[in-house]
Structure formats: C-alpha cells, structure tokens
C-alpha cells in the first residue's frame, strides 16, 4: 500500500536546526560588515553572538560549536591556529580527566556500589534515616565522580528501598526520595573542581586551585543540602516512618580492588592537601593536575582499569567544551570586547545595587540552565561576566563562581541536568511533580546564592 511521505518530527527539527545555523551565519556576516565599532570589537561581538546562539539552541552539538571557536578565531585573524588551540591543553582539562579515570576504576571494581551499600546499612532498616544517609552519600560521592554516574548508581538503591511501598498511596514518599537523589547529586557536585564541569570552567578562568575551591565549595554544599532537602520535604510531605529491608552488598577484596581503593584515597588526600604540599616544596605549579595525571597513569599501569575503560568513561565532548569556553574568553579579552561590554553594562547598571546585580545574574543562570546544558551555560557566561564584573563593582571571581554554582542548581525540568533526566527516565516521576518541587528550589536557591555571593564573597 502506498503511503504519502510525511516529514517526521526529527526531520522537521533537523530543518529547524539547519535554518538556525544558516541565519546565524548570515547574522555573523552582517555584524562583521555593519557594526559601527572597532573592527576587532566587531569580530569579538560577532563570534560571541554566533557561538551563543548555537550553544543556546543546540542547533549544532555543543562540542562541535566549541570547536568552531578556535576555527573562527583563526579564520577572522584574531589568533593564529597555535594560539587558538592553546586553551584546549589547559591543565584544568587534565584535572577533570583524572576524575573520569577515577570513576572508571571505581566502577570497574564495583567499589562505588560497595561504598553506597555499606553506608545504607547504617540506617538499620529505618526509611527516614536511610533516606538521609542515601542523600548524604549521594552528595559526597558526587564531589568526586560525575553526578551522572552517581545518580545512575544510587537510583537502584533508592528504588530498592521503596520496593515494598505502594507507589500510589505513598506517592509523596516516592517523589521525595527519587527527586532527592537527583538534587543531592547536583548539589554535591558543587563541592570540588571535579564534581561538575562548570566548576572547572570557572576555576580555569580565575586560576582557582583544588583546595581553594573546596574552601567555599564544601561549605556551600553544607548550606544548600539541608535547605534543599528541607524544602523538598515541605513541598512533597512524605511519610518516612516505614521500615525497609536493604540487600546486603558483599565483595571479595581482591588485589585490584585494594589497589583501586588505595589510588582513590591517595588522590583525594593529595588533592585536599595540594596547597601545603606545594608550599613545602617551594611552589609546584599546577600540582592538582599533576596529581590527576599520576592517578590516571597509576590506574592503567596497575591494570585496575584498562585504557579502554577510562576512554569509554570519559566525556571527551565536555573536555572540548572547556577548551572552547576558555578560547572564547581569550578572544573577548584580545579583541577588547570584554572592555567594550564592561563599559556599556556598567553604564546601564551603574545605579543598581550590587545585591540586585547578583540576584539578577543568579536567576538568569538558574533558569537558563533549565533549557541549556549547564556546561554550555558556564562556558558562555563565565568569560562574558568575568570581563565586566569589575565595572559593575563585583569581584570577577565571585561572579564566575556564582555562575558555576548557579549552573548546578536547575531542578525544575528533566532536561535541565543529567541527574534530573535519569530520575525522570525511571518512570516513577511525573514532569509536573518535578516542576512543582523544582520551581520552589529554583526560587529559594536563587536568593540563597545571591546572599552567599554578597555576604561571603570576600573569602574568594
């Protein structure tokens, strides 16, 4: 039987994406030709707008868009190719690569599941305590391995805890526990440089070390976690008085598992103590990255994980996105675009209270991340606002860190963050339930982040 050809939704979307790319190219050409500013500023503004549109619409994959940054910089004569690609070898990329390698080794040897399971037994079958411990270990593990991997690992444990409850009668409890897993993973990732890509982007931009980030990252987690969980509790009103059975997790301590644990603990201790260690040896540049690279070599050489395991567990696209964001920052500075934007934004916001500026920025980042990759948001906004911060009377470090943390605080939509998407994909959460709880957290966290930036920003 003959059927007429009807464009599928993906085909129509492909047409829309192609149209966006074509219009974006035309806009870039128009800006280069007709903007009335200095030619170099025109180039900087053109590249910024061109890349921003592609990142925000995802008309091209965000990684491909990141690779367009050095390409445009070279073609338009801002940098030569060597200079354009310099930031793709930034030490922060290798630091984050070390985090991927550690996660690969823990997963390969089953130690991630073991640690989670053992902590759960401390609850002694009480659902309330079990949930608190579950959220705590989720946040703690998310500091060291990706929040995506952490959520994927902890979700089965959470579902197992709820297995004996009636999902209809105990709907609020299901929503509280499962959303709590996703939100704990996102919040926990704020704590360290390797916890979430936006952290590394801000750190690379501002030259923040591993220990320096933890000095405020961990306290922020300690503040946001109880606030977030308490607010989620008030919104959902779960019943946590049940008793549950938790399956025992046993593991044979083979040589490989012992070596994996030793590498993990050694790396964490060295990262935490990197500043005093560096000072003791007269100042070792980029010690955090050296530690990460040592961990990668130790993991593969000791055969606790193969190179293929590390390779498959590494999100190379995220690393390329780092490079694109850092190169964009260099372009804005070299072309004078940052100074140009600073003078104009400062004129517009010259009479605005600093807290209002921080509040507006936090709200913009949080709600933008609901629709755009948090990594892409940070890669775009950190270079832009770091360049205009001083003109607005705000420390560039404070503004960059606020953007990075805000990019991890989008809780309303499944597409906002990988943890949200994983929990939603389990089939146990409806989107309207996530939107109701997430909206409350978004609003409260926006205010909290602005307050923290305003009152505690001096420690940065």
Predicted regions and their residues:
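Short helical (or helix-break) motifs at transmembrane helix termini and adjacent helical loops
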Residues: 113, 152-155, 159-164, 196-201, ...
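Helix-coil boundary and interhelical linker segments in multi-pass alpha-helical membrane proteins
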Residues: 206-212, 386-397, 458-460
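Membrane-core helix-loop-helix motifs of multi-pass transport proteins
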Residues: 10, 165-238, 245-250, 422-452
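Alpha-helical transmembrane segments of multi-pass membrane proteins
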Residues: 127-142, 167-188, 222, 354-367, ...
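Hydrophobic transmembrane alpha-helices of multi-pass small-molecule transporters
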Residues: 1-95, 212-343, 441-442, 446, ...
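Membrane-water interface of transmembrane alpha-helices
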Residues: 105-109, 153-158, 230-240, 415-416
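Alpha-helical transmembrane segments
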Residues: 91-101, 143-150, 213-228, 399-408
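Membrane-embedded alpha-helical segments and adjacent helix-loop junctions characteristic
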Residues: 9, 13, 50, 64, ...
């Amino acid at each position: 039987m003959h059927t007429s050809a009807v464009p599928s939704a993906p085909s129509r979307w492909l047409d829309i994406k192609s149209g966006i790319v074509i219009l974006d190219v035309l806009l870039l050409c128009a800006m280069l030709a007709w903007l009335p500013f200095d030619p170099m500023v025109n180039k900087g503004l053109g590249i910024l707008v061109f890349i921003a549109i592609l990142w925000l619409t995802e008309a091209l994959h965000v990684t491909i868009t990141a690779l367009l940054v050095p390409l445009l910089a070279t073609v338009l004569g801002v940098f030569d190719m060597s200079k354009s690609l310099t930031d793709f070898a930034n030490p922060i990329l290798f630091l984050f690569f070390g985090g991927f390698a550690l996660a690969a080794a823990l997963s390969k040897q089953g130690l991630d599941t073991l640690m989670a399971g053992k902590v759960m037994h401390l609850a002694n079958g009480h659902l309330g305590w079990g949930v608190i411990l579950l959220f705590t270990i989720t946040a703690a593990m998310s500091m060291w391995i990706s929040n995506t991997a952490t959520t994927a690992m902890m979700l089965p444990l959470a579902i197992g805890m709820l297995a004996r409850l009636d999902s209809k009668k105990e709907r609020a409890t299901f929503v509280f526990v499962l959303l709590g897993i996703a939100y704990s993973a996102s919040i926990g990732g704020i704590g360290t440089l390797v916890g979430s890509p936006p952290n590394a982007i801000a750190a690379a931009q501002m030259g923040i070390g591993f220990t320096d980030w933890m000095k405020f990252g961990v306290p922020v987690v300690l503040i946001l976690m109880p606030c977030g969980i308490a607010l989620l509790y008030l919104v959902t009103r779960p019943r946590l008085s049940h008793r549950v059975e938790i399956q025992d997790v046993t593991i044979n301590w083979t040589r490989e598992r012992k070596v994996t644990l030793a590498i993990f603990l050694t790396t964490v201790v060295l990262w935490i103590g990197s500043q005093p260690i560096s000072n003791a040896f007269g100042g070792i540049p980029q010690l955090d990255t050296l530690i990460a690279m040592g961990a990668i070599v130790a993991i593969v050489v000791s055969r606790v994980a193969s190179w293929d395991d590390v390779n498959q567990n590494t999100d190379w696209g995220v690393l390329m996105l780092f490079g694109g964001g850092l190169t964009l920052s260099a372009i804005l500075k070299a072309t004078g675009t940052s100074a140009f934007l600073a003078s104009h934004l400062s004129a517009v916001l010259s009479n605005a209270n600093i807290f209002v500026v921080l509040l507006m920025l936090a709200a913009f980042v949080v709600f933008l991340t609901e629709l755009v990759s948090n990594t892409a948001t940070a890669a775009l906004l950190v270079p832009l606002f770091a360049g205009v911060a001083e003109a607005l009377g705000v420390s560039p470090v404070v503004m960059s860190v606020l953007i990075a943390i805000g990019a991890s605080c989008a809780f309303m939509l499944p597409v906002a963050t990988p943890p949200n998407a994983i929990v939603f994909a389990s089939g146990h959460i409806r989107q309207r339930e996530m939107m109701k709880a997430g909206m409350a957290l978004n609003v409260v966290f926006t205010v909290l982040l602005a307050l923290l930036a305003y009152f505690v920003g001096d420690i940065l």
